[in-house]
Curated annotation (Swiss-Prot):
Gene3D superfamilies: Leucine Dehydrogenase, chain A, domain 1, NAD(P)-binding Rossmann-like Domain
Pathway where it operates: Metabolic intermediate biosynthesis; chorismate biosynthesis; chorismate from D-erythrose 4-phosphate and phosphoenolpyruvate: step 4/7
Record-linked SUPFAM superfamilies: Aminoacid dehydrogenase-like, N-terminal domain, NAD(P)-binding Rossmann-fold domains
Pfam assignment, any one: Shikimate_DH
Keywords per UniProt: Amino-acid biosynthesis, Aromatic amino acid biosynthesis, NADP, Oxidoreductase
Gene it is expressed from: aroE
GO biological process per UniProt: amino acid biosynthetic process; aromatic amino acid family biosynthetic process; chorismate biosynthetic process; shikimate metabolic process
Active site: K71 (proton acceptor)
Name the UniProt record assigns to this protein: Shikimate dehydrogenase
GO molecular function per UniProt: shikimate 3-dehydrogenase (NADP+) activity
Keyword Repeat part of the UniProt annotation: no
Membership in a protein family: Belongs to the shikimate dehydrogenase family.
Enzyme Commission numbers on file: 1.1.1.25
Entry-linked InterPro entries: Aminoacid_DH-like_N_sf (IPR046346), NAD(P)-bd_dom_sf (IPR036291), Shikimate_DH-bd_N (IPR013708), Shikimate_DH_fam (IPR022893), Shikm_DH/Glu-tRNA_Rdtase (IPR006151)
Length: 260
């Protein structure tokens, strides 16, 4: 049990309507196991109060995570670093600097899972697709996008073109890597569950219908909880220079019945 004292460091996640977040459970468990005197809270901030509250949080908190819908606006309040600056979104803050550990998580997990790939199809054109696009582009992957809203997909393509990243709208989903960045795993039709690797950002349940379909075809997978835990541990490395192993954190979440 954490004993809060004068030296206890304050960290937390900033978002709106984030009662679902697993971040406090993940980080408080990790801090306890690593012997770090810190506490991690959820800061649920309404959009009309963000500009008033957020700058103060940046000043008093030892470190922060940023989640929906503030990953893009929060970058204006910090000095964005490397990938975060290119992506135009941050999810981690430390010492007034902004980082994107979503990018680090996806890139590292893909490299661990498969070593040869050329093409990628991403379902969805929202915020979750951003880090995946940059990570896969930096791994020399040719990227296609499938999205219900053609207008939204075209807007994403134009935005990426301004960052020297070429992506295409496609209806041909035959690729080495398939990514679901939407909230609905069933948005990916069966004929598109192919290639070498399937990635699903959804983490409740951990084994989504998409992950299950991929496993039934003996395709390698990366599930949403792997991405969530990896980006969290990468954030801890930025804050404290150390972290737990991903597997230990995942096992803890299962034991607490926080994931299933």
């Amino acid at each position: 049990m954490l004993e809060i004292n004068y030296d206890t460091k304050l960290l937390g996640v900033v978002g709106e309507n984030i009662s679902y977040t697993l971040s406090p459970a993940i980080h408080n468990y990790s801090f306890q196991e690593l012997g770090i005197n810190a506490v991690y809270l959820a800061f649920d901030i309404k959009s009309d109060e963000f500009k008033e509250i957020f700058p103060g949080l940046v000043k008093i908190a030892y470190g922060l995570n940023i989640t929906i819908p503030y990953k893009e606006i929060a970058i204006k309040y910090v000095e964005a670093q490397s990938e975060a600056k290119r992506i135009g979104a941050i999810n981690t803050i430390f010492n007034g600097k902004g980082y994107n550990t979503d990018y680090i998580a996806i890139k590292s997990l893909v490299q661990e899972r498969i070593d040869k790939f050329e093409t990628c199809t991403i379902f969805g054109a929202g915020g979750a697709a951003r880090a995946a696009i940059f990570a896969l582009h930096d791994l020399d992957c040719s990227i296609n996008v499938i999205n219900r809203s053609k207008e939204k997909a075209e807007k994403l393509i134009e935005e990426m073109r301004n960052k020297n990243i070429e992506i295409k709208i496609t209806y041909n989903c035959k690729s080495d890597i398939i990514v679901n960045s939407t909230p609905n795993p069933d948005f990916v039709p069966d004929e598109c569950v192919n290639g070498k690797l399937v990635i699903d950002f959804v983490y409740k349940p951990v084994i989504t219908s998409l992950i299950k379909r991929a496993q039934n075809k003996n395709i390698k997978t990366i599930n949403g909880i792997e991405i969530l835990v990896r980006q969290a541990m990468e954030a801890e490395k930025i804050w404290f220079g150390k972290s737990l192993e991903d597997e230990e954190v995942v096992n803890y979440l299962y034991a607490r019945k926080l994931i299933w």
